[in-house]
Structures are given as structure tokens and as C-alpha cells.
A protein has these predicted regions:
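Catalytic core of Fe(II)/2-oxoglutarate
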Residues: 163-223
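Conserved hydrophobic/aromatic beta-strand scaffold that supports enzyme active sites
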Residues: 53, 141, 150-152, 186-188, ...
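Structured loops at beta-to-helix junctions and adjacent beta-edge loops in soluble globular domains
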Residues: 51, 57, 123-125, 154, ...
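N-terminal auxiliary "cap/dimerization" subdomain that precedes the catalytic jelly-roll/cupin core
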Residues: 1-78
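Catalytic core of non-heme Fe(II) oxygenases with the double-stranded beta-helix
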Residues: 114-182
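Short glycine-rich, low-complexity/disordered patches
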Residues: 39-51, 110-124
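Signature of the catalytic double-stranded beta-helix
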Residues: 61-121
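Glycine-rich, often proline-containing surface loops adjacent to acidic residues and nearby aromatics
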Residues: 5-13, 79-91, 163
């Protein structure tokens, strides 16, 4: 079982930051998104997903045992999402072994000053759209995840428009940050300070489009 550590210092002056991570190449990621299983908890089957949890020991990334994702309805009101244990297939070990995947975890942990014993959850997500159906990267609407820190690392945008990520201090106010995340972009967010949302995606031309991202959280919310 994961530890939610009281010693995590949230006085650290990190609120949110957006940066391009030039040291991480997208090469090698694409094939691992092509075979993602469908998210069984999303009604319209437009999302594909894997999930694993890790800890960082020094600069060694250590995969943790399989577990279940749990968020309360107060954070995730989507039917079949909140207040239930959700189980997803693990991220492929061959992907975990990639140098660029491990660099991504190190960049997240270093930037957010993640406690050495804190778990990191990594969600590998593809959201698809078609001429007849938009894809919704954030079916929860404007929300928090119920964790300390969130990282969104953009891997690919294929034949899509939309998909802008917004940050809010209040649901009733305009976003304080709004940007389409392009491949190699990393957005880091203090989940205690900001709500987040990503707008739906639609295809640019009349064929399937998709958005590929890794979402990193600490704590992992996996039990």
C-alpha cells in the first residue's frame, strides 16, 4: 500500500510551470500507444489507457506491484469512475525500460521535489476522435485529481484540433493558463492550488485523430 507522506513540504514555492523537455525524444513511444487497451470505464470507448506506479530510489526507477486506482466522487463525479476501484493493464515493461521514459519520470520528480518514498502514478492515455464523435480528455470537467502534484507530458497530436489545457483557481473564473501542449511539452501543477481541464478534440480532416499523453501524479492514488 502506498504511503501518503505528511512530510511532503507543500510550502515549496511550486505552483505550476510549463516547459519543453528537449532531452526527451518521442522516438520509441508511438508503438506503445498503438496497442493500448480501451478504458472500460468510459461509456463511449474513446479513451485507451494503461496505468502503473513507481518509486524513485536515487536515479533508479522501481516499478511497484499492481494495484487499483481510487478517487472519491468529490474529485471524480464521472459515472463508473468515482468511489469505485478501477483496474487498468500495466504499462509495458519494454516501455518502462526506455531511457526516455525514465528521463520523463526523473524530470517530474526533480521539478516537483517529490519525496524519495512517495509513489508516482503514471497514466498512459490515448484519446481518439472521429468525424462523428469528439474525444474528451477530461470527462470530469474542471477538476482536481486529489493528489499533490500532477505532470502532463505530451507525446503526440495526430489530426486533431482542440485539446487545450486550462488551469483555474476557481471554477467560475477564467483560466490563469491556457495552452495546447505539443510533443515534448511538460506541464507541472500543484493540485492543491489549481483545478485543471483539457478541451475536447475533433479531427482536422475526415478521419480518426488522437492525442497521446502521459499523466504523472504523486501520490499515485493506487492501492
Amino acid at each position: 500500500m502506498q504511503k501518503i507522506l505528511e512530510s511532503i513540504n507543500l510550502d515549496y514555492a511550486f505552483m505550476f510551470t510549463h516547459k519543453k523537455v528537449n532531452s526527451i525524444s518521442m522516438e520509441g513511444f508511438e508503438k506503445f500507444f498503438a496497442d493500448l487497451p480501451v478504458d472500460p470505464y468510459i461509456k463511449d470507448k474513446y479513451r485507451y489507457r494503461r496505468l502503473s506506479r513507481f518509486i524513485l530510489s536515487g536515479e533508479e526507477v522501481i516499478k511497484q506491484p499492481h494495484g487499483y486506482l481510487f478517487q472519491s466522487k468529490s474529485y471524480n463525479p464521472v459515472p463508473n469512475y468515482g468511489d469505485i476501484k478501477r483496474e487498468y493493464a500495466e504499462i509495458d515493461d519494454k516501455l518502462v525500460a526506455l531511457d526516455n521514459f525514465q528521463k520523463m519520470i526523473l524530470a517530474f520528480c526533480d521539478s516537483c521535489k517529490i519525496h524519495p518514498e512517495a509513489e508516482i502514478g503514471i497514466h498512459q492515455i490515448r484519446t481518439i476522435c472521429s468525424p462523428n464523435h469528439s474525444g474528451n480528455p477530461a470527462p470530469e470537467g474542471i477538476h482536481r485529481d486529489g493528489t499533490d502534484f500532477i505532470g502532463i507530458f505530451a507525446v503526440n497530436r495526430h489530426n486533431i484540433q482542440g485539446g487545450a489545457t486550462h488551469l483555474y483557481t476557481n471554477r467560475k473564473e477564467k483560466p490563469v493558463f491556457s495552452k495546447v501542449l505539443n510533443p515534448g511539452d511538460l506541464l507541472l501543477v500543484n493540485d492543491h492550488e489549481f483545478l485543471h481541464f483539457t478541451t475536447p478534440i475533433k479531427p482536422v480532416v475526415e478521419e480518426v485523430g488522437y492525442r497521446d499523453v502521459f499523466v504523472l501524479t504523486s501520490p499515485s492514488l493506487i492501492y
